[in-house]
Amino acid sequence: MAKLRLGALEAGGTKMVCAIGDENGTIYEQVSIPTTTPKETIPKMIAYFRDKGIDALGIACFGPIELDRDSEKYGYITTTPKLAWRDCDIVGQMQEALHCPVGFDTDVNGSVLGEVTFGQAQGKKCVMYLTIGTGVGGGIYSNGELHHGMLHPETGHVLITKRTADTYAGRCPYHKNCLEGLAAGPAIEERWGRKAVDL
């Protein structure tokens, strides 16, 4: 039986990682495309996948995103702090261009699923995956299921009590001083005047 040829898209706030692999977790190739605006970035992702002969595409995306399949906005990036991407129908655009099934979940749920399926969390029943990058997020896998909806932790937007001497206001457009607004990569760069990788 032939292996499925699968496309994978890790949609991040700084870069979009596009890859081709199979159901056994083998990655055949991958590219990184800078995340600018949907108008610039989505056509580049479509161009990468268009001639790859994929059977399906999985998208693990920064959020918040709409995961309710009954919603007219299923597949949209919704109230993201990445303003250019607000109300972007990423699934619809990819599906229309590539004519294949598209799976869609949060970037952190994609990461935790990868760890449970192929990585360090194989065989575990309950796993939480935390990430700090352009944003802050957390994904939960418990008893064979990824958590969604009210059970999905928007970890990055938990409000934080700062030290009284800390005068940094934070950079989240919604809460300012949430975890993401204070500790994600852009906040670190703004606080220290250098990229986090250089600290």
Regions flagged by a language model, labelled:
Residues A2-G7:
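Extreme N-terminal starter segment of soluble prokaryotic enzymes
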Residues P38, I42, A56, I65-C126, ...:
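Glycine-rich phosphate-binding loop and adjoining helix at the ATP-binding site
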Residues L9-T14, T131-G135:
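A short acidic Gly-Thr/Ser loop motif
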Residues I20-E23, E29, K39, G103, ...:
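Glycine/GP-enriched mid-protein hinge/lid loop-to-helix segment characteristic of carbohydrate kinases
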Residues T14, G25-T26, Y76, E145:
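Residue-level signal for well-ordered, solvent-exposed loop/turn and beta-edge residues enriched
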Residues N24-I54:
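N-terminal phosphate-binding loop and adjacent alpha-helix
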Residues C18, I33, I59, I188:
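Residue-level signal for inorganic ion chemistry
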Residues L57-P64, I132-T134:
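Glycine-rich beta-strand-to-loop/alpha-helix junction loops that act as flexible
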